[in-house]
Curated annotation (Swiss-Prot):
PANTHER family assigned to the protein according to its UniProt record, in alphabetical order: DISULFIDE BOND FORMATION PROTEIN B
Membrane topology category: Multi-pass membrane protein
Keyword check for Repeat: no
Primary location recorded for the protein, binned into one broad class: membrane
Gene3D superfamilies for the chain: DsbB-like
Entry GO MF terms: electron transfer activity; protein-disulfide reductase activity
Segments traversing the membrane: 10-26, 45-61, 69-85, 143-161
GO BP term, pick one: protein folding
Identification of the protein by name: Disulfide bond formation protein B 2
Length: 175
């Protein structure tokens, strides 16, 4: 029963990611909301989460494979969570907080010899800081933050249920 539950959870996660990407493309095409750089990063993370979850649902792996898929989904969801969190911070930060952030990021990019990214960063950081659309008073990056939080919590169920199962069998002398 455990594997059937995790397979269903992975399928739900892939369905949620596909729905989110569909809504994002609808908002871009029908409403005219152009995505910024951080929005594109979040879209890539949603696509990666969806593909990974769909592969896990179709593959129906054993306990070891479920752990691996769960860990991969957790890492990708945490990366998306970082991108969405950064965009939410950019939207709530004041101008005096944005300038040192952009300056520090420019220094890091120049150390990495990514000077061509600096001009794009300057314009995109200000573009990402704009709140262009809300639903129920919540902006799109905040919705993404909520979705990535759910996607990060979802793989914890298989990971911790496996851990509790392992601890229970170890206490009985099963291993």
């Amino acid at each position: 029963m455990y594997l059937a539950r995790t397979r269903f959870l992975f399928f739900l996660a892939s369905l949620a990611c596909a729905s989110i990407i569909g809504v994002a493309f609808y908002l871009q095409q029908a409403v005219g909301l152009d995505p910024c750089t951080l929005c594109m990063v979040q879209r890539a993370a949603f696509i990666a989460c969806g593909v990974l979850a769909l592969c896990a649902a179709c593959h129906a792996p054993g306990p070891t494979g479920t752990r691996r898929y769960s860990l991969g989904l957790l890492l990708v969801a945490l990366a998306g969570l970082a991108g969405a969190g950064t965009q939410v911070w950019l939207q709530t930060a004041s101008a005096d907080q944005l300038i040192p952030f952009i300056t520090r990021l420019e220094q890091i990019l120049s150390l990495l010899s990514l000077d061509m990214c600096i001009d794009r960063l300057r314009s995109d950081a200000l573009f990402c800081a704009e709140i262009t659309w809300t639903l129920f008073g919540i902006s799109l990056p905040e919705w993404s933050l909520l979705a990535f939080t759910g996607l990060a919590l979802l793989p914890l169920y298989p990971l911790f249920s496996e851990l509790s199962h392992w601890l229970a069998t170890r206490d009985r002398g099963g291993y």
